[in-house]
Amino acid sequence: IRPATVDDLFALVALLRSHDLPVDGFADLLRASPQHVLVAELNAVVVGSAALDVHGPHALLRSVAVARDLAALGVGKRLVSDLLAQAKASGVTSVYLLTTTAAAWFPKFGFTVTDRARVPADLAATVEFTKACPASATVMSLSLSTP
């Protein structure tokens, strides 16, 4: 697992599309904040991705995908865990996500379903919320604040 580079863009977009995940805004995020986009590689082939779109103390977890034949090996769990640790270390206090297929998978990290109206305005204005994901997508959140 390593930070992505713009050279990974084609492979990452292909991976996201193979999972029917939105790619709107992904290239811009990768160019602006490559440190917030992680890739997993196997034999020099991109097999996983996860990204954080950071807006001050809030972040949107997006673009989590793993090659289908490697899905049971914990690659996705490692990608998400690494990004959440990075987020916490950089001062992010809350992470949100949208999903249409994985609402049962994210609670293992502490995410809970939340109301769309509770999403901070800066995240609600992102392309994921306004264009890329359907209004029927499940919204989940995780607090990284230490009590």
Placement of each model-derived feature along the sequence:
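Conserved active-site alpha-helix within GNAT-family acetyltransferase domains
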Residues: 93, 100-128
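Short beta->alpha linker loops
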Residues: 7, 56, 100-101
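Conserved acetyl-CoA-binding loop-helix of GNAT-fold acetyltransferases
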Residues: 66, 72-89, 97
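C-terminal "cap" of GNAT-fold acetyltransferases
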Residues: 119-147
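Active-site rim helix/loop that mediates acceptor-substrate recognition in acyltransferases
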Residues: 13-46
